[in-house]
């Protein structure tokens, strides 16, 4: 008898879960997001430069494939780069990108999510500034970045029922910023707030 009750309860739970997933399968959100960047560059996968403080802003589309799983595509303008200090002087390179992250999101709880996914970035501008006392390397050399950057994002955050989200993300760059200069790669922390429209 108990076994029959357990089977019945299990079937009801399965049906309820399936219905809940179907209700959320076609759910989608579109919104705006922006926030604060802490950007640096890693050389040879070890030594990391000082951080550049900057920002990012963009749009996103989030589509649920089940109650707890969603895909999110973003189009983002991101100010990145790095700082190097030596002998009282500072060298700063400002690198501006248009980034396109594609994120696999999981919601283990209703308002909490984890995310991971690839990102492609396109360098659109760069600018170098330095003090006259800076002499760690030759500042007259060319600092033209590669047009294409790519890597992986990891992150998490909270999203309320009314569509406001707070998130933290780490971008692990896997493509070299320059050619033949010690494998410099982007390392960026992003702290963002988003709003569904």
PLM regions with names:
Residues 1-26:
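Cleavable N-terminal export/targeting peptides
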Residues 24, 63-67, 106-110, 160-162, ...:
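Outer-membrane beta-barrel strand-turn architecture
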Residues 26-28, 49-55, 94-98, 148-152, ...:
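Residues that define the transmembrane beta-barrel architecture of outer-membrane proteins
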Residues 32-34, 73-75, 102, 116, ...:
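Membrane-embedded beta-strand positions of outer-membrane beta-barrel proteins
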Residues 36-40, 77-81, 120-124, 170-174, ...:
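Transmembrane beta-strands of outer-membrane beta-barrel pores
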Residues 37, 113, 155-165, 185-197:
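Outer-membrane beta-barrel "beta-signal"
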Residues 42-48, 83-90, 127-134, 178-183:
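Outer-membrane beta-barrel translocator domains and adjoining extracellular loop/strand segments
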Residues 68-71, 111-114, 162-168:
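Repeated loop/turn-to-beta-strand initiation elements of outer-membrane beta-barrel proteins
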């Amino acid at each position: 008898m108990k076994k029959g009750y357990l089977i019945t309860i299990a079937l009801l739970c399965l049906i309820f879960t399936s219905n809940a997933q179907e209700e959320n399968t076609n759910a989608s959100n579109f919104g705006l997001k922006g926030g604060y960047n802490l950007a640096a560059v890693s050389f040879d996968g070890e030594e990391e430069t000082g951080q550049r403080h900057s920002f990012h802003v963009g749009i996103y589309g989030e589509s649920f494939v089940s109650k707890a799983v969603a895909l999110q595509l973003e189009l983002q303008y991101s100010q990145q780069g790095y700082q190097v200090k030596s002998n009282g002087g500072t060298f700063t390179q400002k690198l501006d990108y248009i980034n396109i992250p594609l994120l696999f999101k999981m919601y283990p709880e209703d308002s909490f999510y984890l995310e991971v996914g690839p990102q492609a970035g396109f360098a659109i501008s760069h600018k170098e500034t330095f003090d006259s006392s800076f002499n760690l390397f030759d500042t007259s050399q060319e600092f033209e970045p590669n047009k294409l950057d790519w890597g992986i994002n990891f992150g998490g955050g909270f999203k309320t029922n009314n569509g406001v989200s707070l998130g933290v993300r780490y971008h692990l760059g896997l493509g070299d910023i320059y050619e033949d200069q010690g494998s410099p790669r982007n390392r960026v922390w992003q702290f963002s707030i988003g709003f569904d429209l």
